[in-house]
Amino acid sequence: MPRKGHVAKPEVLPDPIYNSKLVTSLINHLMLDGKRGTASKILYQALDQIKEQTGNDPIEVFEQAMENIKPALEVKARRIGGSNYQVPIEVRPDRQRTLALRWLVQYARLRGEHTMVERLSGEIIDASNNTGASIKKKEDTLRMAEANRAFAHYRW
């Protein structure tokens, strides 16, 4: 925690091709070892593949996938009287976007296709159709929050 007040988050610049900040954020989440060129090449090829497979605008498909993945609730561990409770809390919009991007990349990497381009495009298409592993992760998170609704009064 900073002693000198609030530290502003750095501004994310929109990407040069689609002019979207969301695409830049996905590139940043895809990037390994600082290789931005490789990550952006993978993403742009995946978006081209989405356009071929669906016939729709790839940015619209990606944004629909993000809306479907974003969690509304999550649980947070809270220690009260020697016991740990999983307390359901609402997720802030910036954290919703971060979790959605993280889950999208995480479950794309676990898919069985040969190249990362195929994996990423497949996961984005599945998420836009409300299927896929990242949607299952969101539903599991929501189910966990619903199961622990009895502890909601411990919110802080």
Swiss-Prot record:
It comes from Limosilactobacillus fermentum (strain NBRC 3956 / LMG 18251). Keywords: Ribonucleoprotein, Ribosomal protein, RNA-binding, rRNA-binding, tRNA-binding. One of its GO terms (biological process) is translation. GO terms for cellular component: small ribosomal subunit. It comes from the Bacteria. Part of the 30S ribosomal subunit. Contacts proteins S9 and S11. The keyword tRNA-binding applies. GO terms for molecular function: rRNA binding; structural constituent of ribosome; tRNA binding. PROSITE patterns: RIBOSOMAL_S7. InterPro entries: Ribosomal_uS7, Ribosomal_uS7_bac/org-type, Ribosomal_uS7_CS, Ribosomal_uS7_dom, Ribosomal_uS7_dom_sf. This is Small ribosomal subunit protein uS7. The lineage of its organism: Bacteria, Bacillati, Bacillota, Bacilli, Lactobacillales. The gene is rpsG. Gene3D superfamilies: Ribosomal protein S7 domain. Belongs to the universal ribosomal protein uS7 family. One of the primary rRNA binding proteins, it binds directly to 16S rRNA where it nucleates assembly of the head domain of the 30S subunit. Is located at the subunit interface close to the decoding center, probably blocks exit of the E-site tRNA.
